[in-house]
Amino acid sequence: MAKKTGLKIDGAAELGKLLQSLPEKLRKKAAREATRRAAELVFKQAKANIRRADGAYRVTLKGGETITRQPGELADAMIMTHVPEAKSYLSQHKVTFARKKHNDVWKIAHFIESGVNVHRITSKNGQEYTHPGHRAYPFLKPAVSKNKAQIYRLIKDGIGDGMKDVLKKKK
């Protein structure tokens, strides 16, 4: 399965205490704005990092059906979404892949991100095939690791701006 990539923020405990002291509506608005901004940055960078094929290519699916994939299908299937009622988080956004679009291309995203070892595949009729594997072509991890400082700043600014917006509406 795909691995989750998260960030640890210095001072997060203090920030959490400060946010807990605020009214719930203000707290949720500020947290949602902060996570949206950070996820948007990661989303755009990851989409730009995704490896694209040079041309159309054929793929045989598990049931034996052969389909043709187009370059950029994985990038087109990438979405950013808010996770409502995220447990143990004030707010959570995630970068993931649309499930229904693009011939289930979402199923291969984690293989591209982390690579595949050489392995044997046995078909239903008993024939064996050695899959050569492939190296990793990470797109999500670099989007997070290269932009950590900017992500921290976006979270900080997002919380501040979210609080300002709610306070303006109260006046």
Q: What residue ranges belong to the model's regions?
A:
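Short, low-complexity, charged/polar segments at coil/turn and helix-coil boundaries
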Residues: 5, 17-20, 24-131, 161, ...
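A general, composition-driven signal for non-globular sequence regions
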Residues: 21, 26, 140-142, 152
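Small-xxx-small helix-packing motif
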Residues: 11-12
